[in-house]
Protein backbone atom coordinates (compact mmCIF):
# COMPACT_ATOMS: atom_id res chain seq x y z
CA UNK A 1 0.00 0.00 0.00
CA UNK A 2 1.00 3.61 -0.50
CA UNK A 3 0.25 6.62 1.65
CA UNK A 4 -0.01 10.12 0.17
CA UNK A 5 0.27 13.03 2.58
CA UNK A 6 0.31 16.78 3.03
CA UNK A 7 1.23 18.58 6.26
CA UNK A 8 0.73 21.99 7.85
CA UNK A 9 1.88 23.68 11.05
CA UNK A 10 -0.94 25.09 13.17
CA UNK A 11 -0.20 27.73 15.87
CA UNK A 12 -1.81 27.14 19.26
CA UNK A 13 -4.08 30.20 18.97
CA UNK A 14 -5.53 28.83 15.72
CA UNK A 15 -6.29 25.33 17.01
CA UNK A 16 -9.89 25.85 18.19
CA UNK A 17 -10.89 27.84 15.11
CA UNK A 18 -9.43 25.19 12.78
CA UNK A 19 -11.30 22.44 14.64
CA UNK A 20 -14.54 24.29 13.97
CA UNK A 21 -13.63 24.83 10.32
CA UNK A 22 -12.81 21.14 9.84
CA UNK A 23 -16.04 20.13 11.54
CA UNK A 24 -17.97 22.30 9.09
CA UNK A 25 -16.02 21.06 6.07
CA UNK A 26 -16.43 17.38 6.92
CA UNK A 27 -19.92 17.65 8.47
CA UNK A 28 -18.80 15.65 11.50
CA UNK A 29 -17.68 16.20 15.05
CA UNK A 30 -13.98 15.62 15.80
CA UNK A 31 -13.08 12.13 16.97
CA UNK A 32 -10.60 12.61 19.79
CA UNK A 33 -7.63 10.26 19.75
CA UNK A 34 -4.87 9.45 22.22
CA UNK A 35 -2.17 6.95 21.30
CA UNK A 36 0.91 5.43 22.84
CA UNK A 37 3.65 5.14 20.23
CA UNK A 38 6.57 2.84 20.97
CA UNK A 39 9.64 3.19 18.76
CA UNK A 40 11.67 0.06 17.95
CA UNK A 41 14.89 -0.24 15.97
CA UNK A 42 15.90 -3.25 13.87
CA UNK A 43 19.19 -4.84 14.87
CA UNK A 44 18.95 -7.99 12.76
CA UNK A 45 19.53 -8.28 9.03
CA UNK A 46 16.40 -8.81 6.89
CA UNK A 47 15.50 -12.36 5.99
CA UNK A 48 16.31 -13.75 9.46
CA UNK A 49 13.03 -12.91 11.20
CA UNK A 50 10.57 -15.65 12.15
CA UNK A 51 7.33 -14.13 13.43
CA UNK A 52 5.97 -17.41 14.80
CA UNK A 53 7.11 -16.87 18.37
CA UNK A 54 5.42 -16.59 21.74
CA UNK A 55 2.21 -14.58 21.88
CA UNK A 56 2.05 -14.28 18.08
CA UNK A 57 0.37 -17.69 17.97
CA UNK A 58 -2.95 -15.88 18.51
CA UNK A 59 -2.61 -13.88 15.30
CA UNK A 60 -4.50 -14.82 12.16
CA UNK A 61 -2.71 -16.08 9.04
CA UNK A 62 -3.19 -12.84 7.09
CA UNK A 63 -1.72 -10.80 9.96
CA UNK A 64 1.30 -13.12 10.16
CA UNK A 65 1.89 -12.74 6.43
CA UNK A 66 1.82 -8.95 6.73
CA UNK A 67 4.20 -9.08 9.70
CA UNK A 68 6.60 -11.32 7.78
CA UNK A 69 6.64 -8.93 4.83
CA UNK A 70 7.21 -5.86 7.01
CA UNK A 71 9.81 -7.31 9.36
CA UNK A 72 11.87 -8.99 6.64
CA UNK A 73 11.89 -6.06 4.23
CA UNK A 74 14.93 -4.22 5.58
CA UNK A 75 16.35 -2.60 8.69
CA UNK A 76 14.07 0.22 9.81
CA UNK A 77 12.76 2.05 12.81
CA UNK A 78 9.15 1.02 13.23
CA UNK A 79 6.34 2.04 15.58
CA UNK A 80 4.05 -0.03 17.76
CA UNK A 81 0.86 1.97 18.32
CA UNK A 82 -1.78 1.47 21.01
CA UNK A 83 -4.97 3.46 21.69
CA UNK A 84 -5.43 4.84 25.20
CA UNK A 85 -7.95 7.11 26.92
CA UNK A 86 -7.54 10.22 29.04
CA UNK A 87 -8.59 8.15 32.06
CA UNK A 88 -5.60 5.83 31.51
CA UNK A 89 -3.18 8.67 32.28
CA UNK A 90 -2.52 8.87 35.99
CA UNK A 91 -4.57 5.73 36.64
CA UNK A 92 -3.12 3.03 38.91
CA UNK A 93 -1.92 -0.19 37.31
CA UNK A 94 -4.51 -2.95 37.14
CA UNK A 95 -4.37 -5.02 40.36
CA UNK A 96 -3.63 -8.74 40.31
CA UNK A 97 -6.80 -10.78 39.85
CA UNK A 98 -6.33 -12.94 42.96
CA UNK A 99 -5.96 -9.82 45.10
CA UNK A 100 -9.30 -8.56 43.80
CA UNK A 101 -10.95 -11.82 44.78
CA UNK A 102 -10.09 -11.24 48.46
CA UNK A 103 -11.39 -7.68 48.66
CA UNK A 104 -14.10 -6.90 51.17
CA UNK A 105 -17.52 -5.76 49.97
CA UNK A 106 -16.58 -2.12 50.55
CA UNK A 107 -13.34 -2.50 48.63
CA UNK A 108 -15.16 -4.20 45.77
CA UNK A 109 -17.52 -1.23 45.44
CA UNK A 110 -14.54 1.11 45.50
CA UNK A 111 -12.75 -0.91 42.81
CA UNK A 112 -15.75 -0.55 40.52
CA UNK A 113 -15.44 3.22 40.73
CA UNK A 114 -11.66 3.21 40.26
CA UNK A 115 -10.29 3.20 36.73
CA UNK A 116 -7.20 1.06 36.26
CA UNK A 117 -4.79 1.03 33.34
CA UNK A 118 -4.56 -2.60 32.22
CA UNK A 119 -1.21 -2.90 30.44
CA UNK A 120 -1.58 -6.66 30.02
CA UNK A 121 -4.63 -6.10 27.81
CA UNK A 122 -3.30 -3.07 25.92
CA UNK A 123 -4.00 -3.63 22.20
CA UNK A 124 -1.19 -2.90 19.75
CA UNK A 125 -0.58 -2.70 16.04
CA UNK A 126 2.68 -2.50 14.13
CA UNK A 127 2.93 0.45 11.73
CA UNK A 128 5.60 0.33 9.05
CA UNK A 129 6.44 3.46 7.09
CA UNK A 130 9.18 3.51 4.43
CA UNK A 131 11.27 6.58 3.66
CA UNK A 132 9.24 8.79 1.27
CA UNK A 133 9.95 8.40 -2.42
CA UNK A 134 12.73 10.66 -3.70
CA UNK A 135 11.09 11.59 -7.01
CA UNK A 136 7.41 11.96 -6.24
CA UNK A 137 4.85 12.12 -9.01
CA UNK A 138 3.51 15.40 -7.70
CA UNK A 139 3.96 17.82 -4.82
CA UNK A 140 2.81 15.34 -2.16
CA UNK A 141 4.69 13.05 0.21
CA UNK A 142 4.37 9.46 -1.03
CA UNK A 143 5.63 6.40 0.84
CA UNK A 144 5.07 2.67 1.21
CA UNK A 145 3.14 1.74 4.33
CA UNK A 146 1.61 -1.25 6.05
CA UNK A 147 0.15 -2.20 9.41
CA UNK A 148 -0.72 -5.40 11.25
CA UNK A 149 -2.23 -6.39 14.58
CA UNK A 150 0.08 -7.52 17.38
CA UNK A 151 -0.44 -9.52 20.58
CA UNK A 152 -1.84 -7.58 23.54
CA UNK A 153 0.17 -6.66 26.62
CA UNK A 154 3.96 -6.74 26.90
CA UNK A 155 5.12 -6.49 23.31
CA UNK A 156 8.87 -6.32 23.98
CA UNK A 157 9.44 -10.11 24.03
CA UNK A 158 8.01 -10.80 20.56
CA UNK A 159 9.57 -7.61 19.15
CA UNK A 160 13.00 -8.65 20.51
CA UNK A 161 12.53 -12.12 19.01
CA UNK A 162 11.73 -10.49 15.67
CA UNK A 163 14.98 -8.52 15.77
CA UNK A 164 13.78 -5.18 17.18
CA UNK A 165 14.96 -3.34 20.29
CA UNK A 166 12.88 -0.79 22.19
CA UNK A 167 14.24 2.75 21.77
CA UNK A 168 11.76 5.19 23.26
CA UNK A 169 8.08 6.07 23.43
CA UNK A 170 5.88 9.13 23.21
CA UNK A 171 2.18 9.92 23.01
CA UNK A 172 0.06 11.59 20.36
CA UNK A 173 -3.08 13.57 21.14
CA UNK A 174 -5.41 14.97 18.53
CA UNK A 175 -8.65 14.84 16.57
CA UNK A 176 -9.60 12.86 13.48
CA UNK A 177 -11.86 14.00 10.64
CA UNK A 178 -12.86 12.09 7.50
CA UNK A 179 -13.34 14.04 4.27
CA UNK A 180 -14.30 11.69 1.44
CA UNK A 181 -11.20 9.45 1.13
CA UNK A 182 -8.93 11.76 3.17
CA UNK A 183 -8.12 11.16 6.84
CA UNK A 184 -7.38 14.50 8.51
CA UNK A 185 -5.47 14.33 11.80
CA UNK A 186 -4.94 17.53 13.78
CA UNK A 187 -2.53 16.49 16.52
CA UNK A 188 0.46 17.17 18.71
CA UNK A 189 3.27 15.00 20.11
CA UNK A 190 3.58 14.66 23.89
CA UNK A 191 6.75 13.67 25.74
CA UNK A 192 6.81 11.78 29.03
CA UNK A 193 8.28 13.55 32.09
CA UNK A 194 11.05 10.90 32.37
CA UNK A 195 12.75 8.48 30.00
CA UNK A 196 12.20 4.74 30.34
CA UNK A 197 14.27 1.75 29.21
CA UNK A 198 11.12 -0.25 28.44
CA UNK A 199 7.45 0.43 27.67
CA UNK A 200 5.64 1.86 30.68
CA UNK A 201 3.18 -0.31 32.59
CA UNK A 202 1.66 2.80 34.15
CA UNK A 203 1.10 6.21 32.57
CA UNK A 204 1.75 9.57 34.28
CA UNK A 205 -1.00 12.15 34.65
CA UNK A 206 -1.80 13.82 31.35
CA UNK A 207 -0.91 17.25 32.73
CA UNK A 208 2.63 15.97 33.39
CA UNK A 209 3.17 15.32 29.69
CA UNK A 210 4.99 18.08 27.79
CA UNK A 211 4.35 19.03 24.14
CA UNK A 212 7.22 18.49 21.72
CA UNK A 213 6.39 21.95 20.35
CA UNK A 214 6.82 24.13 23.43
CA UNK A 215 4.82 26.90 21.76
CA UNK A 216 1.74 24.66 21.93
CA UNK A 217 1.44 24.28 18.18
CA UNK A 218 -0.19 21.38 16.34
CA UNK A 219 0.41 19.50 13.10
CA UNK A 220 -2.33 19.03 10.52
CA UNK A 221 -1.83 15.82 8.54
CA UNK A 222 -3.97 14.94 5.52
CA UNK A 223 -3.53 11.37 4.29
CA UNK A 224 -4.95 9.07 1.63
CA UNK A 225 -4.19 5.34 1.52
CA UNK A 226 -3.89 3.81 -1.95
CA UNK A 227 -4.05 0.02 -2.17
CA UNK A 228 -2.22 -0.24 -5.51
CA UNK A 229 0.65 2.23 -5.57
CA UNK A 230 1.65 1.00 -9.00
CA UNK A 231 -1.59 2.27 -10.54
CA UNK A 232 -0.58 5.67 -11.89
CA UNK A 233 -4.15 6.83 -12.46
CA UNK A 234 -5.22 5.99 -8.91
CA UNK A 235 -2.20 7.78 -7.47
CA UNK A 236 -2.92 10.82 -9.62
CA UNK A 237 -6.55 10.97 -8.48
CA UNK A 238 -5.50 10.66 -4.83
CA UNK A 239 -3.03 13.52 -5.26
CA UNK A 240 -5.73 15.67 -6.85
CA UNK A 241 -8.02 15.02 -3.88
CA UNK A 242 -5.29 16.26 -1.53
CA UNK A 243 -4.77 19.34 -3.69
CA UNK A 244 -8.52 19.98 -3.52
CA UNK A 245 -8.39 19.92 0.28
CA UNK A 246 -5.36 22.20 0.21
CA UNK A 247 -7.33 24.70 -1.85
CA UNK A 248 -10.32 24.53 0.52
CA UNK A 249 -8.12 25.21 3.56
CA UNK A 250 -5.70 27.72 2.02
CA UNK A 251 -7.21 30.65 3.91
CA UNK A 252 -6.47 28.88 7.22
CA UNK A 253 -3.34 26.76 6.77
CA UNK A 254 -0.67 25.98 4.21
CA UNK A 255 -0.71 22.27 3.40
CA UNK A 256 2.53 21.17 1.77
CA UNK A 257 4.89 18.30 1.13
CA UNK A 258 7.12 17.25 4.04
CA UNK A 259 10.90 17.22 3.92
CA UNK A 260 11.78 13.69 2.81
CA UNK A 261 14.73 13.14 5.14
CA UNK A 262 12.73 14.26 8.18
CA UNK A 263 10.60 11.14 7.64
CA UNK A 264 13.55 8.77 7.04
CA UNK A 265 12.82 5.54 8.96
CA UNK A 266 15.91 3.57 7.91
CA UNK A 267 18.03 2.15 10.74
CA UNK A 268 21.61 3.29 10.20
UniProtKB/Swiss-Prot annotation:
Q: What's one GO MF term for it?
A: transcription coregulator activity
Which Gene Ontology cellular-component terms appear in the entry? Answer: core mediator complex; mediator complex
Q: Which UniProt keywords apply?
A: Activator, Nucleus, Transcription, Transcription regulation
Q: Which domain of life is it from?
A: Eukaryota
Pfam hit, one: Med18
**Compartments (UniProt record):** Nucleus
- Entry function: Component of the Mediator complex, a coactivator involved in the regulated transcription of nearly all RNA polymerase II-dependent genes. Mediator functions as a bridge to convey information from gene-specific regulatory proteins to the basal RNA polymerase II transcription machinery. Mediator is recruited to promoters by direct interactions with regulatory proteins and serves as a scaffold for the assembly of a functional preinitiation complex with RNA polymerase II and the general transcription factors.
**Assembly notes:** Component of the Mediator complex.
Descriptive protein name:
Mediator of RNA polymerase II transcription subunit 18
Amino acid sequence: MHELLLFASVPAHQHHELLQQLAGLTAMQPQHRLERRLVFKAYRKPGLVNVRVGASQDLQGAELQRLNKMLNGGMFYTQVVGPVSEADFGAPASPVADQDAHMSGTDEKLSVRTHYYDYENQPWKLEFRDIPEAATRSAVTARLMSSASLPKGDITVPMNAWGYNFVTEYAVEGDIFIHNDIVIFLHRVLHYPTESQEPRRQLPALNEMTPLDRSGGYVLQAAITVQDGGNQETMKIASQHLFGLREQLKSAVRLEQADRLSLDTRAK
